[in-house]
C-alpha cells in the first residue's frame, strides 16, 4: 500500500517563487565600500528574471556552466538563481585559488561565461588566454578597479546594460530534481581540485536543513550577514535559506575588515553572522562597547574555533560562537554544535570545552568512523580514530 501524498520536484525554482510571492517587501542590502545599496526581494526577482533572458540571449547552452568570480553582493545572488532556475549550472569560482587551479577548473567545468566583479577583474584577466571554451565575459561594476587593456580578445559586456535590454521572463519547468544546479571545486585534496556538483534536490534538502532549529535556524525574522564567501560551499547554504524564508540579507561586498563588518552588524541589527575564525578575531575588538543585542547566532567553520575566541565573544556579547562542521562535499552543513538540555546544566567551563567540538551529526546525514581502508567501524568510545564516512540527502 502506498501513501496518498503528492509528489513534486524539489527544485530551487520553488525557493525563488516563494520569495517572489510572499516576501517581496524584504530587503537585500549590499555594502559597496562607500555606502549601502538597497533592493527588495521583488526587485531582485524581476532582475533575476531579466538575467535569465540575458543567458538566453548570450546563447548559453541549456545546461551550460555559468561561472562567477565575485564577492557577496545582490548581483551575485541574482546569478545564484538565474542559472539553475533556467536549467543551467552555476559555477562559483574561488577567487583565492592559485592561477593554475583556476585555469584547470574553468576548463574542466567547460564554463561558457564568467560574470566578474570589476574590483577583481585584474586577477582574472591574465588567465583569459588559458580558458579554452569561454564565450563571454561580463563585468559587474562594483565601482573600483582598473579595466585591463588586454582581455585576450574578449569583449567586456556590462551586466547592467545586458539586464536593461531584457524583459523579465518565466523560468522553464525543471522536471528532474536531480538535475545539476551548481558546482564548487574543492582544493582540499591531493592533485587538481575536485568538482562537487549539487542537484536541485540536494540544494532544496540542504536549505530545509539550514532552517531547522538544531542547525542554523534561518527564519523570516532574521537579518543574515553571510561573511563566508558565496564561492565557498554555497555560502554555507545561507543564501538559499535566506531567500527561502524571506530573511533580510546583508551582503558585505569586498570589504571584510573588522571595522566594516562590525558596523554592518551593529547598524543593520544583524541576527545571524557567519564566517571563519580569522574573521571573528578581527571583528571582536571592533564590537567592544557597542550594541550587539540583535545577534542570536554566530556560526563559524572552516577551521576549529579556538576556545578562547568563543569565550571572548560570550564574555563580551553574551553569545558564544556556534561551531559547525562540513565540507564542500557535504553542501556543507554536516554538524552544528548546539548544547543539549543536559549539557546546558554543566558548569561554564565544561560548556566552553564542549563548544570546541563540532557537535552532533545533522538530521538527514549518517556518519561513521571506520578503520583505515576498510568498512569496519571503530569502537565508539571517544578515543579511537579512523576515517570518517558520511552519506545523506545532500552528501556527494
Where are the predicted features?
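Conserved AMP-binding/adenylate-forming core of the ANL superfamily
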Residues: 28-73, 77-81, 98-103, 155-161
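Structural core segment of the AMP-binding/adenylate-forming
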Residues: 15, 57-58, 85-164
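N-lobe entry segment of adenylate-forming
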Residues: 1-58, 62, 86, 133, ...
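Conserved AMP-binding/adenylation subdomain of ANL enzymes
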Residues: 204-223, 231-271, 286
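Flexible, low-complexity linker/hinge segments
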Residues: 1-10, 125, 145-180
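Adenylate-forming
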Residues: 71, 116-126, 142-143, 228, ...
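Conserved adenylate-forming
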Residues: 55-60, 166-179, 183-225, 237, ...
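Conserved AMP-binding/adenylate-forming
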Residues: 298, 305-324, 328-396
